[in-house]
């Protein structure tokens, strides 16, 4: 019965079309084969019966609720009677004429498409052919002469066997992808508990430091220097948790379609730093659990991969170890080794161990021991991660004594890492902004050798681009090609506020002192040094995670002349927090929930800038912007910055066509938000 239900659910999206095709097709083809191209035998009552059966499929959504449970079985009856049964019956009654041989072949193709489970389809075929033979025997006076052409039988068998074989293979692949997607979806939901738990703890700490108004309201409250320092540290940690959570979602979602881990964000990391961070940031159920983990670094090493993914591998191993602890004297020992051939991280615990029959299956997809709470991405995901790094993970265990997981990483100079970097480099995009021929020639030669995608633009061409057209992995800007006055630099920097690329300023004598604060901090590279070692420098800029510069503190916006900003967003929390952030900078803030409220508020208030969400109920941001721009009122020219979480080309086209002035992608840190606002008011 479960197979019958699955067949019906699979076909359901197309059933209305199938129903109309059968309802209209059966009587129409009676006219075709009876009058236009007469055949030896036709049967109008039988065709009307099939047409009525298909009408039941059209009418299925209007049937009484208590009858709908029988719809899957009804669908099987209809397909059996109206496809193999009807067409084989007509084939027999027409003495295997060519018209009905071709018609029966068409019915086979349609049958395979409508019934995707092979066993059900073959049962229907045998039942249908059996009924057709019986009815033909009865119709011919309990006598049936088989004048069949046996040369047609191999063709029918070929269609049935290979049609089902190919269709079954595609169906298995489709179901595997769906299962993987479900597994990753459930895993993401579970694994996000770690950063959410961290945020919850951060909020608890903040609330414990802040004065409680219920204990007595005051006009002013005083915080000690220690409390202020603690709040700063906690908020900084919370921002790191949010960044890590966003990166994790992005990394895991890219793995769903391909059943493998995406390598697009791989960089060189210190294994010791990542492991230490994983130990400190793991969500322990008990405070004493932290002391159960020890780290022994016998030799440090770097690896090419994702620090976030390695942390989640460590989280999984810790979680499984704690879940299978067997005594109060439980401990987890992490050891790091390194030699000239390979690097290893070994995680050993003295828990309940793993049985030999289970040990063979723990890295297989969708495997679970069945113990409550044993969910998440699990060990199969750990295997995928380690293989994406060019390494592997294996397990040894003794039941009741210990378990040991050994993660092996290739060395940075190994052929495996070089191959991964070579494949990744082909997918990298680099923008080079320069008007010096020697530099352009050099980077062009390197691009051919390293095989990355290179775009070379002069300054006027850069200034013609939109912000969203700077989606590169690396942007190299020759400062000597920009004018000395700084006007070009300001314009270029304003265009780069949206990009996630690593931005490099190349200088010949000394870095230029910049008075203007921007939302990014560039990396300064001496041009001569870059020319002497171009390939190594580009390789380091693309893959060295430690090649970073500290972020600059946010520069307060100039609010001497108090300006008014309208924040339009249906997300109450985001709207309120954005308003608080702007009010701290000295702005007047008006909050509205949708585009219609925003237009009504504009009729009553003078607004200098609108920060507008896109997806909102009642009236979305795009439509609201069109109405604002189309009005003949004073606010028609007010700057509108789209505040959206969707940066797809379709959304950006909508933003541009609506008359919005600019856009910023959620989540945006305050530096980027302030810099964007400063460009317009």
Curated annotation (Swiss-Prot):
Senses the quorum-sensing autoinducer CAI-1 ((S)-3-hydroxytridecan-4-one) which probably functions as an intragenus signal. The sensory signal is then relayed to LuxU and LuxO. PROSITE patterns: HIS_KIN, RESPONSE_REGULATORY. The modification Phosphohistidine is found at residue 190. One of its GO terms (molecular function) is phosphorelay sensor kinase activity. The chain crosses the membrane at residues 17-37, 73-93, 112-132, 148-168. Its main location: membrane. It comes from Vibrio campbellii (strain ATCC BAA-1116). It holds the Pfam family Response_reg. One of its GO terms (cellular component) is plasma membrane. This is CAI-1 autoinducer sensor kinase/phosphatase CqsS. It comes from the Bacteria. Keywords: ATP-binding, Cell membrane, Hydrolase, Kinase, Membrane, Nucleotide-binding, Phosphoprotein, Protein phosphatase, Transferase, Transmembrane, Transmembrane helix. Disulfide bonds: none annotated. InterPro entries: CheY-like_superfamily (IPR011006), HATPase_C_sf (IPR036890), His_kinase_dom (IPR005467), HisK_dim/P_dom (IPR003661), HisK_dim/P_sf (IPR036097), Sig_transdc_His_kin-like_C (IPR004358), Sig_transdc_resp-reg_receiver (IPR001789). The lineage of its organism: Bacteria, Pseudomonadati, Pseudomonadota, Gammaproteobacteria, Vibrionales. Residues 564-681 form the Response regulatory domain. It catalyses: ATP + protein L-histidine = ADP + protein N-phospho-L-histidine. It is a multi-pass membrane protein. The modification 4-aspartylphosphate is found at residue 613. Its EC number is 2.7.13.3, 3.1.3.-. The keyword Ligase does not apply.
